[in-house]
């Protein structure tokens, strides 16, 4: 065949960010005649690269193919400024050259996190636990040291660096180090420092048993009033007192008292340990609806060994709240939905009411519909009426039930309503809301209050 100049293609290696290794790149020349060819490699500044390896030309389909490889230390790529190197080819039918891009060594700094032990996590004799330090999200993968401050030599276990699991984006790495500490050293308010060095920079995280800006700022107390829905359903008022950021739970006490007659029976529940190593506790007491609605004040008192003095918070029914009765509308399923012969969706709109606390329930054949058959929105402000609220409830039934003529009733309870309750019903025959008295269904749950 006639003489033919080569076509040149770069061959780029995968990233290898181990600074002690080398990265191989290559240059492919193809479709040339005659078969004699010479490769050379240069940096961007045209200085020669000598660590090369050539392969003999191979005849394929009447023309020749040849490759050349070059080897560069990873550390040169990590720390160098070149973005490519140059592959030059000399051939009797014409010289050519091609830029071969260097692998991109993405640099991402580590995020260093410390995880402190909860107070109940110390075991044994002497009592011990672990501080955990994790560096994550960094690239390349080398971390020059991971150590705890004051150059602690014993009790430190550092895992291997590992790639973080992710579906997309650049590969990043993480490493975890554990330091075994004794309880008396931890409680002596020593500061432990985890230091991570990456690409010549030092990142660190402090940990101690003292309160710091990234640890809980102290025990907090929140009183929660009874909701109208719970008052309506149980015919009693439940007072709740939430205590958060407890380092330990064994010494916490929560008690409810009232203005008159003193102490209330208080039931306390303790949470599981939270991710930040703290606990929370809930103290609940029950009073009569009339007592709550009278405006009487109730006080939650909290004691704990970490508190210099008791915490108290008082709650009572808000006074002077504007009260507006809701308008209630029940809408039948749309004709388009029924034509699909699958399901029927009924809507109950509750509009223009205040305060926002409301209770909505669906009733069929005189019995409450199971709660998993309908969904009720949270109260939302009326867009055109400041201070008023609306909510809606959606009930889904089978198309057969609707077409059989079943009657469905939306029951709405709100403190502004006569007898606290109103209802609207709809069925296939009317296609529009009708009144249907179901108040007795719900009032049967009334309990005695002593």
From Swiss-Prot:
GO terms for cellular component: immunoglobulin complex, circulating. SMART domains: IGc1. It comes from Canis lupus familiaris. This is Ig mu chain C region. Keywords: Immunoglobulin domain. One of its GO terms (molecular function) is immunoglobulin receptor binding. It comes from the Eukaryota. One of its GO terms (biological process) is antibacterial humoral response. SUPFAM superfamilies: Immunoglobulin (SSF48726).
């Amino acid at each position: 065949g006639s003489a033919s100049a080569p076509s040149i293609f770069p061959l780029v290696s995968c990233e290898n960010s181990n600074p002690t290794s080398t990265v191989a790149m290559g240059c492919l020349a193809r479709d040339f005649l005659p078969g004699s060819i010479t490769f050379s490699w240069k940096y961007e500044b045209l200085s020669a690269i000598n660590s090369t390896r050539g392969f003999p030309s191979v005849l394929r389909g009447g023309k020749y193919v040849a490759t050349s490889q070059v080897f560069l230390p990873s550390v040169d790529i990590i720390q160098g400024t070149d973005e490519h190197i140059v592959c030059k080819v000399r051939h009797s039918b014409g010289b050519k050259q091609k830029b071969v891009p260097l692998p991109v060594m993405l640099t991402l700094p580590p995020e260093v996190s410390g995880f402190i032990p909860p107070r109940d996590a110390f075991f044994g004799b002497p009592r011990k636990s672990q501080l955990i330090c994790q560096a994550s999200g960094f690239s390349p993968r080398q971390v020059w040291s991971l150590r705890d401050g004051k150059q602690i030599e014993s009790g430190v276990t550092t895992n291997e660096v590992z790639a973080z699991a992710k579906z997309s984006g650049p590969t990043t790495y993480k490493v975890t180090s554990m330091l075994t500490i004794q309880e008396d050293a931890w409680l002596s308010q020593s500061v432990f420092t985890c230091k991570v060095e990456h690409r010549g920079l030092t990142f660190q995280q402090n940990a101690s048993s003292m309160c710091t800006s990234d640890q809980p700022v102290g025990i907090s107390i929140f009183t929660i009033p009874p909701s109208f829905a719970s008052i309506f359903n149980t015919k009693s008022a439940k007072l709740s007192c939430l205590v958060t950021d407890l380092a330990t739970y064994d010494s916490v006490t929560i008690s409810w008292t009232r203005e008159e007659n003193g102490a209330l029976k208080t039931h306390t529940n303790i949470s599981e340990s939270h991710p930040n190593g703290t606990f929370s506790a809930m103290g609940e007491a029950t009073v009569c609806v009339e007592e709550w609605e009278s405006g009487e004040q109730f006080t939650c008192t909290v004691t704990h060994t970490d508190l210099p003095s008791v915490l108290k918070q008082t709650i009572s029914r808000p006074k002077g709240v504007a009260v507006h009765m809701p308008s209630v509308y029940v809408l039948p399923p749309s004709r388009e939905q029924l034509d699909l012969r699958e399901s029927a969706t009924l809507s109950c709109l509750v509009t223009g009411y205040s305060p926002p606390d409301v209770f909505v329930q669906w009733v069929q054949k005189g019995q409450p519909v199971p709660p998993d058959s309908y969904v009720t929105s949270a109260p939302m402000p009326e867009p055109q009426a400041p201070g008023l609220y609306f909510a809606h409830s959606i009930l889904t039934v089978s198309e057969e039930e609707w077409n059989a003529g079943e009657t469905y009733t939306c029951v709405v309870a709100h403190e502004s309503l006569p007898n606290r309750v109103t209802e609207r019903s709809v069925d296939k025959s009317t296609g529009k809301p009708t009144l249907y008295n179901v108040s007795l269904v719900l009032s049967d749950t009334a309990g005695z209050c002593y």
